[in-house]
């Protein structure tokens, strides 16, 4: 059983002056402290190159430390910030690390810590990642204690770069010490998938090719690159959210039942199903790039001055998948993601096969929708008799909206959940090295095709549209049956973002 980090743990955040730390890491630690899941004896040290004082860092992160409802809690904020300090230093020389080592060891000596517990959070760009890992291992590791290292994506740019990264990391950290964070695995509805699937007989029994007609994993954003064009141009939507976040969701949807919730049992099954994915057919995709909005008020992707004028960067993609195993053989699966669309949401759609005809001439499919964000919810579209004397069908839904059902529950943010898991030593919701390898093997040939000299030109779609032209036909070709116009309206739970 993994050792739980509790009293007198030292958490060091590299890249502490950056946006990720300010908007995600520090607020997540505060959330854990506020709810009683971070021991008040914890010492939190921010480390970066920026010349800041302790007070400078505290003032920088303070506006982002709030309650889940957005309200401030000054007393808790001040208590938390008293646990936070800052040290400036270079990333590429020993000097700053040795100074940091002294600070950590003085704290541990003062607290009479025999077995140090040190958690290092690397909120850093790929360009300096390995240098920092090497210096960290050389200067900040202790033989008498336990170290854990949280690393952020991207975990490589393709299979080759991911393999090279792994080869450099392997001599530095054991797999037990390394926590590759994909924040989607910390989202409440994603963490709910295994319990929902395998803890409910009616769902588990229907979760197969005999009953399921089509599967979709959907990601929509209502905004474009908004100043990140230069960065986004080098990655595109597939690397940004599909090879990592959405694939993690899909593996949890399609994996077999693990023998237990033990981290290795769960990750073993994820790798098994990934290996059963057929290679992506280059003709089984739909790609697009957003243009200006219909009214001209929103810019096109190419209007961004940091983007190459002839860029073929994909900002929307729909990809068909096939899984060659007993459970999923023949079931069409679509993963789709896009920027600059009409709304912001992430959801899973499982459409079931129609019931046999005979007593029913034309009855809609059942459909299970799992809303990951925003406003977590589960809907089951089903058929029922319309109240009254007539024997007519009405399509309705069974509705579990979390904000209504669990009003008095604290639903942790993804980073809160995952940092807590790392403190507990629980790897269940982190990416293992072989899992990363198989995922890149699946996507790299497609990326090479799209980015090669003979790669296709993405279709232009207007900023703010519901979907690019051709998506309805693409989904229909992949087994999805649309409701008749006006026959049913899905519950509206997604505010425009």
From Swiss-Prot:
Entry GO MF terms: glucose-6-phosphate dehydrogenase activity; NADP binding
Top-level division of the source organism's lineage: Eukaryota
Pfam families xrefs: G6PD_C, G6PD_N
Coiled-coil parts of chain: none
Oxidoreductase is among the record's keywords: yes
InterPro entries for this protein: G6P_DH (IPR001282), G6P_DH_AS (IPR019796), G6P_DH_C (IPR022675), G6P_DH_NAD-bd (IPR022674), NAD(P)-bd_dom_sf (IPR036291)
Gene Ontology CC: one annotated term: cytosol
Residue numbers binding D-glucose 6-phosphate: 153, 183-187, 221, 240, 339, 373
Binding site for NADP(+) 1: 15-22, 49, 153
Keyword NADP belongs to the record: yes
One GO BP annotation of this record: pentose-phosphate shunt, oxidative branch
Residues binding NADP(+) 2, per UniProt: 336, 345, 349, 371, 379-381, 399-401, 466
Entry keyword set: Carbohydrate metabolism, Glucose metabolism, NADP, Oxidoreductase
Active site: 245 (proton acceptor)
Entry EC no(s): 1.1.1.49
Membership in a protein family: Belongs to the glucose-6-phosphate dehydrogenase family.
Function description: Catalyzes the rate-limiting step of the oxidative pentose-phosphate pathway, which represents a route for the dissimilation of carbohydrates besides glycolysis. The main function of this enzyme is to provide reducing power (NADPH) and pentose phosphates for fatty acid and nucleic acid synthesis.
PANTHER family the record matches: GLUCOSE-6-PHOSPHATE 1-DEHYDROGENASE, GLUCOSE-6-PHOSPHATE 1-DEHYDROGENASE G6PD
Name the UniProt record assigns to this protein: Glucose-6-phosphate 1-dehydrogenase
Source organism of this protein record: Kluyveromyces lactis (strain ATCC 8585 / CBS 2359 / DSM 70799 / NBRC 1267 / NRRL Y-1140 / WM37)
Lineage, broadest ranks: Eukaryota, Fungi, Dikarya, Ascomycota, Saccharomycotina
Gene name per UniProt: ZWF
